[in-house]
Amino acid sequence: MTGGSELAEISAGKVKELREQTGAGMMDCKKALSEANGDMTRAGEILREKGIAKASKRVGRAGSEGRVIAAVSEDGKHGGMVELNSETDFVAKTDDFAHVGTHLAQAALAHAPKSVEELLDLSVKGEKLRDKVTAAVAKMGEDLAVRRVTHLQAPASGFVASYIHAGGKIGTLVAIEAAIPVKPEARALAHNVCMHIAATSPASLSRDDLPKALVDAERRVLTAQAASEGKPPNIVEKMIEGRLTKFFKEVVLLEQGLVMDPDKTVGKAAQEAGARVVGFRRFQLGEAAEE
């Protein structure tokens, strides 16, 4: 009976405030406030402790649902992007999920972490991002996992642009070199290139950036194909070079036809806009992450 009267003494206002702060249930908030003798800070700590205990049981359950979240600094010089996974698409569409993802992306652009672990060990306003994610797990009731993180920096004369496609299924960042102040044509070009990358998933920025092993493997395949056609060696070599050029146009960003204007390559479109594409990042939800 005593416990019931103690719970009754906790004001509805405090319970409501604690619920808004923590996302915990009404009775959990009442009990925590009672245990903390009405101290809101201590009650929050009690719920956090209990929430973390619940959250720990969910570790490893995040799947391929979630969102890609990107952010660009106010000066346009840095971009950050993360893939945050959840167990269900329902949770991935909540404001709480978006809030956590935005914090992670903002930290990525500000600190350029080289790994997920480095990102989660960062502190923002006195709170480790790892703890922020864990608290979100407790509040939302299912596991979250930061799958990968990236950072992109603009050249001294230039900026970073971002684009999120299909509600967070794909995210892109593009670094553009352009004269300052940046002209509208360069801004429009950056946006178009971001969307282009989302659609085409290029393997590299330029030929020089393609992994040698990938080019060598393609050359071997093309050599075998050309040789099987019984052509003279000098013709075979020309066929290989021609087919390699076609391969580069399919996988190299600067050589691809711009989706919005296929008659122009991305490189040519950038040149006409008085800009140059110098880097990009692309995340697609659930795809195999590079080691």
Q: How would you name each of these model-derived features?
A:
Residues 2-291:
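N-terminal assembly/interaction segments in proteins that build large macromolecular machines
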